[in-house]
UniProtKB/Swiss-Prot annotation:
A Pfam family per the record: DUF489
Annotated GO CC locations: cytoplasm; plasma membrane
Originating gene: hflD
Record membrane topology: Peripheral membrane protein
Protein name (Swiss-Prot/TrEMBL): High frequency lysogenization protein HflD homolog
Coiled coil: none
Location in or out of the cell: Cytoplasm; Cell inner membrane
Main location: cytoplasm
Listed Gene3D superfamilies: HflD-like
PANTHER family xref list: HIGH FREQUENCY LYSOGENIZATION PROTEIN HFLD
Stretch forming the signal peptide: none
Protein species of origin: Photorhabdus laumondii subsp. laumondii (strain DSM 15139 / CIP 105565 / TT01) (Photorhabdus luminescens subsp. laumondii)
Length: 208
């Protein structure tokens, strides 16, 4: 069966968007609110109709991730590009550890289902929501190890709300990595199918 490179590219863009938003937060203490909303909602959408539905049914919701993906493929691995690549590969590695740990997978599903039922009690994109998602990341994902080392401004990274947002976005990145594997994504594509992925990303961006 032929791989659906459109869906693979969307899911990979989700992972890249997670990495890019973490970069922006850790260095600048700000990032695109709509893109963060897309990532948070991707966690809570546990029964999507399609891959695009995971991201709110609009390709433009992944614009930051698609551009980050092109940057990762097209630039030399130094500075910001190296950090982004490290985040992406770390998220993919955490997904593999998660899938090999049935207890952790079950716990993640249960915690997200519970939060999905409780989300009426949270203001969208509120501190409470970020703390709840961060709690899931700390309790379920972090113990899988190794932990993702986030680099940035020490002053910014000491802020508890920034810490919660970073962990929530990383949780979304793991969710996207699970999706990526489910639709046929794999690490070898990052080496051997990059031109096809680059072209697909450019095609999607052309009508975002």
């Amino acid at each position: 069966m032929a791989k659906n490179h459109y869906n693979i590219t969307l899911a990979l863009a989700g992972i890249c968007q997670s990495g890019r938003l973490v970069q922006q937060l850790s260095h600048e203490n700000q990032c695109d609110t709509d893109a963060v909303t897309t990532m948070v909602n991707s966690i809570l959408n546990t029964n999507p109709a399609s891959v695009l539905d995971v991201f709110g049914n609009h390709e433009r919701n992944l614009k930051i991730g698609l551009n980050a993906m092109l940057g990762m493929f097209n630039s030399s691995n130094n500075g910001i590009s190296a950090d982004l690549t490290r985040y992406i590969l770390s998220l993919i590695a955490l997904e593999r550890r998660l899938m090999k740990n049935q207890a952790a997978s079950d716990a993640l599903g249960n915690r997200i289902s519970l939060l999905e039922r409780q989300q009426a009690y949270f203001e969208p994109m509120s501190e409470g929501m970020f703390n709840a998602l961060a709690g899931i990341y700390v309790d379920v994902i972090s113990p899988l190890g190794p932990r993702i080392q986030v680099t940035g401004s020490p002053d910014i990274l000491r802020n508890p709300l920034v810490q919660a947002k970073v962990r929530a976005i990383l949780l979304a990145g793991v969710r996207c990595a699970v999706l990526w594997q489910q639709v046929g994504g794999g690490r070898l594509q990052l080496m051997f199918s990059r031109q096809r992925l680059i072209q697909q990303a450019k095609d999607i961006l052309s009508h975002c």
